């Protein structure tokens, strides 16, 4: 039997942790944290500014895990589940080994305690105390071992639970992979079928396009051949013949209209001669828009027109309202769009006598002018080539070409890239035909852009002059502005 000596206690005291004095003061209430770096170097956590708090570390790792989970496919998840299942099985094996080792430790502790118990009965004195202290330590180790076994049992249960969970997850992942694979195959098949249908539709469309193209080409060739045949049969073409006939009819109509006006004037003269009224002057000219009306003497005894005072008026067809035309004081007056459908009068004062002349009928509109203006309205902005004859009352000798721009919101007069005048439609703006007489009165208009700035502008033809007036008044009316001449009454300012 082995003899226990007093050195057993001394060895226990040497192996024990020496006591800490009560007078010791620690700098912190917890054990300091350290970090082991490369080459087993120890770093203090407080001295490292790059070390993050536990909350930040958890947040960063959580974000990384979320990103990684988003990137992982179903196959990768299944692979990781299988790895986790293998790890769980390995942990289960390690738990079994730990359990066997724990049983061996219990047997050893029991044998050691029995040996110490038998030894306690054989020794006395100080050795007995040492044996009892050793028995207490063995019992404490047994308690710690029991606690450790409990913890191992709990860990074993958790490992089993985790293993079953991972196994179920692995099966679910495999099932999900199979379902996704089947779904992907079905999608691929449907996509192939759709592509095949599209290809077939494209082939049919190409075939139909080729067939229709050939048919269209044949029809076009037939039309070209028919057109060539008609062209060969009609020399000159019927269109040119119709144009010549239409032009001749217009000339005949104009001559008959002029002859009709002459007959009406002769009839009026006959009536006045029967009433013992001798006509000294008369209004000569075509009573239509685009012409010039002139006051001319009817006899050689008539006073010279330069010594007479003349004033032109416009009135309704029944003569109830008579409106003075401001500035129309010459023997020549060119009707403007305001005069269409009205009767024009000329009051003449000579040698203390007063004479009033009037047109035989109402002023007729110009043929085709309305449709021409409607076509210009659809363009929104129209430019006319003009020549400026007067600027603010002074004669302008230059005959250079200017551009008269009539827009939806404003009127502009330009010479090349230089803007001479540009004004929006307003109540201060005036626009009408020229009222000062002259041989080209039917082709000229008067435009007052604003107070103190006015122009007399000559157009290339009577049609363009009247179209510009009607177009500007149309756009101004859309802006709630009435464009008229000087001292014209606004209630009559309606374009025909």
UniProtKB/Swiss-Prot annotation:
Disruption phenotype: Defect in stomatal movment and hypersensitivity to drought stress. GO terms for biological process: actin filament organization; regulation of stomatal movement. Expressed in roots, stems, leaves, flowers, siliques and guard cells. It comes from the Eukaryota. Changing residue 77 to A: No effect on actin-binding activity. It is found in: Cytoplasm, Cytoskeleton. GO terms for cellular component: cytoplasm; cytoskeleton. Gene3D superfamilies: 2.30.29.140, 2.60.40.2700, ATP synthase delta/epsilon subunit, C-terminal domain (1.20.5.440). InterPro entries: SCAB, SCAB-ABD, SCAB-Ig, SCAB-PH, SCAB_CC. Keywords: Actin-binding, Coiled coil, Cytoplasm, Cytoskeleton. GO terms for molecular function: actin binding. Residues 126-269 form a coiled coil. The NT5 region (73-100) is required for actin-binding activity. Belongs to the SCAB family. Plant-specific actin binding protein that bundles and stabilizes microfilaments (MFs). Has no nucleation or capping activity. Regulates MF reorganization during stomatal closure. The binding to F-actin is insensitive to Ca(2+) and pH. Binds weakly to inositol phosphates. Dimer. Dimerization is required for actin-binding activity. This is Stomatal closure-related actin-binding protein 1.
